[in-house]
Amino acid sequence: MNNIMIGRFVPGDSWIHRLDPRTKMIGTFIFIFVMLWSTSWATYAWSAAFVVLAIRLTKQPFRLYWDGLKPIFWLILFTVVLQLFFTPGTPVLLHAGPLKVTIPGIINAIYVMIRFVLIILMSTILTLTTPPTSIANALESLLKPLKKIHVPVAELSLMLSIALRFVPLLMDETQKIMNAQKSRGMSFSTGGPIKRAKAIVPLLIPLFVGALQRALDLANAMEVRGFQDATQRTKYRVLSYGSNDRSAFIGLIGFTIIFIGINFFIK
């Protein structure tokens, strides 16, 4: 559970850390968007090289990102299996009832796995190098035009900030409950999938109670400090673009242009 990196910020002084959070968020959104249009090995190789370069620029060990992939391994595997057995095409390599393994299915499964991993790694770069409050402030700034149509942008960014802070707290709380139950003889790693699923059920009630208690404590703390309206909040750190952000946007534009060129000319 402690390997889940969503919502965890690792302080640092790398080039990526110093970027404006809006730059990192825009870059992540653009990367995810272009990855959904990737149709060749060349575009996946180019995207993988871009992600590896971004990780190197964070000056953080790659093991940190690899550990972040482990908790969602089964989700990736499930998605890959669906693509492998349910993608139509020819030739058929294996046929067992309604399940078919085809060459297009294998290729599509590999593409989906690579796409999944690269998108998660890029999203992890954003969360590991940007504090949750900065992510929320960046989102509020980017969505500011929606205020004209009465979208509660400030409240949405506040909710995102709180949610991102709660994710690692809930994971740590889950690990504590699991350790306490293991000390009483409970096993979470033995038996089949059904037995393991049943072993997780006793975790839910104390975890749910703990989450409610943390939410109540947070609400009381905000009320004591006089918090009333998110729209009236001031910012301790004002967001501003710098020379690093201009360089990042140039690099991002270059990546996108090359990606489109590869995707268009290499199939």
From Swiss-Prot:
InterPro entries: ABC/ECF_trnsptr_transmembrane (IPR003339), EcfT (IPR024919). It is found in: Cell membrane. Disulfide bonds: none annotated. This is Energy-coupling factor transporter transmembrane protein EcfT. Keywords: Cell membrane, Membrane, Transmembrane, Transmembrane helix, Transport. One of its GO terms (molecular function) is transmembrane transporter activity. Residues 1-25, 93-100, 172-246 are cytoplasmic. It comes from Leuconostoc mesenteroides subsp. mesenteroides (strain ATCC 8293 / DSM 20343 / BCRC 11652 / CCM 1803 / JCM 6124 / NCDO 523 / NBRC 100496 / NCIMB 8023 / NCTC 12954 / NRRL B-1118 / 37Y). It is a multi-pass membrane protein. Belongs to the energy-coupling factor EcfT family. It comes from the Bacteria. Part of a common energy-coupling factor (ECF) ABC-transporter complex. Unlike classic ABC transporters this ECF transporter provides the energy necessary to transport a number of different substrates including 5-formyltetrahydrofolate, pantothenate and riboflavin. Upon expression of the complex plus FolT in E.coli allows 5-formyltetrahydrofolate uptake; 5-formyltetrahydrofolate is not taken up in the absence of FolT or the EcfA1A2T complex. Forms a stable energy-coupling factor (ECF) transporter complex probably composed of 2 membrane-embedded substrate-binding proteins (S component), 2 ATP-binding proteins (A component) and 2 transmembrane proteins (T component). This complex interacts with a number of substrate-specific components, including FolT, PanT and RibU for 5-formyltetrahydrofolate, pantothenate and riboflavin respectively. May be able to interact with more than 1 S component at a time. The chain crosses the membrane at residues 26-46, 72-92, 101-121, 151-171, 247-267. GO terms for cellular component: plasma membrane.
